[in-house]
Amino acid sequence: HQSILFFNGCWGALKAYRALSKRQDIPPLTIGETANMPFIAALSQDGSEILIKGIKEEIAYSAAGDDKAVSAFLHRLAPRVVKTASFASTSLSATNPVIHVTASLFNVTRIENKEDFYFFGDPMTDRVISFMEHCDEERLAVGKALGIRLSPLLEVLNSFWPEKKNTLKEALKENPSYRAVKGPSSTEYRYF
């Protein structure tokens, strides 16, 4: 039995499931995805190493098929692993689309000018945070319309780390794991 696991799925598992479930020539397969990455990491300057900057305490995932191997693997990565009901639930629970896209759009001139900046530092202004909160309200409304109970962005971020924060701004600016994250250097970067 084989498994395919999409980290920070964002609908990747659903696309793979739709494509592969129609095929008759593949062995039994489990397809899963996580709502978010289990760690914060960056590639070294020379591309030879992955630098782990922080490991999250909780990972949410969904899977189609026998998920025992997927669950066991994720339990090796994080102390808390939560299975959600569907790919829609994990994809809509992803924090990166709300955080990364919003902050990148608000800082697009820095990115186009190839400025070297820390993504979760000065760019997280009150206006950026307010816009993220509005985007999060929309995300929660979409989930509700689909019958999916989603957790607010701050609650999700607080589930990742031992130190809980009272505001989204605190959660993004004061987390030591986020401090070393550099901003994108191109509008071709994955945050877009």
Predicted segments with their positions:
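Conserved aromatic-histidine-acidic binding/catalytic patches
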Residues: 4-8, 123-131, 190-192
